[in-house]
């Protein structure tokens, strides 16, 4: 509530099935499993917006959305990542699946997340790794799997304008896949919902400071801790201060345009 933990509910991801559990802390009982039916795994962590409007779930390993089959040779074309924003009904103490939505992402591997607060309320931030889109295949002369997923010095922090995404849902600018509302990657880019900014390789956590002014990223394979300024990132977005776009068309902010310190 208002960015402060109130101890009423607990949310946790089911890593092997891509579901979210809602636990009522009055009796410590699991009241609900919510399944979006688009992704069959997640990182396990869940993160809530300042007034628990949404519970944020990041898919970890890319797959064809909805569980359809596609050969690994079509990884870049057919596989996708996902960020799900589960609408929470506090009065009922349940996730409202019908009013939840997901944002289609490139087939990088999404990791931990956090929601903005105060000046950054309405935004969310999520790590990623394997922006190399490595799929293994050492027997075919490709790099070993772990080495393949860690070749680059930088991965991408995903920056979401979830308030704008919510407006798109209300305006009907979404698809329905397996009965779940989905903002396509194309729409997310065109409508300014999704941006990337480089972050040191294989990060494991992005935490918003209590003031909501800074995002702190640290990783498993890169020693520095990187602090990003929300205002600097917002200014860069408004100025279109991009270093490039990824191959899916997502704008990439310049690292130094958003970095506060390291």
What do these predicted regions represent?
Residues 1-262:
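Predominantly soluble domains enriched in secretory-pathway, periplasmic, or organellar proteins
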């Amino acid at each position: 509530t208002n960015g402060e933990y109130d101890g009423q509910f607990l949310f946790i991801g089911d890593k092997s099935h891509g579901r979210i559990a809602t636990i009522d802390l009055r009796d410590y009982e699991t009241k609900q499993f919510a399944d979006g039916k688009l992704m069959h795994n997640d990182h396990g962590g869940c993160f809530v917006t300042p007034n628990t409007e949404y519970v944020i779930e990041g898919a970890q390993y890319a797959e064809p959305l909805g569980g359809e089959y596609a050969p690994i040779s079509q990884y870049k074309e057919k596989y996708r990542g996902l960020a799900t924003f589960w609408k929470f009904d506090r009065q009922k103490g349940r996730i409202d699946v019908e009013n939840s939505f997901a944002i289609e992402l490139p087939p990088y591997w999404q990791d931990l997340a956090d929601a903005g607060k105060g000046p950054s309320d309405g935004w969310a931030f999520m790590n990623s790794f394997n922006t190399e889109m490595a799929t293994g295949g050492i027997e075919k002369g490709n790099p070993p799997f772990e080495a393949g997923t860690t070749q680059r010095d930088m991965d991408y922090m995903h920056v979401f304008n979830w308030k704008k995404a919510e407006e798109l849902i209300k305006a009907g600018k979404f698809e329905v896949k397996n009965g779940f509302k989905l903002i396509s990657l194309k729409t997310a880019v065109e409508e300014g919902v999704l941006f990337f900014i480089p972050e040191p390789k294989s990060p494991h956590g992005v935490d918003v400071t209590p003031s909501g002014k800074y995002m702190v990223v640290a990783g498993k394979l890169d020693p520095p801790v990187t602090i990003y300024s929300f205002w600097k990132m917002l200014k860069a977005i408004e100025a279109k201060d991009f270093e490039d776009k990824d191959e899916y068309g997502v704008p990439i902010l310049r690292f130094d345009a958003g970095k506060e310190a390291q």
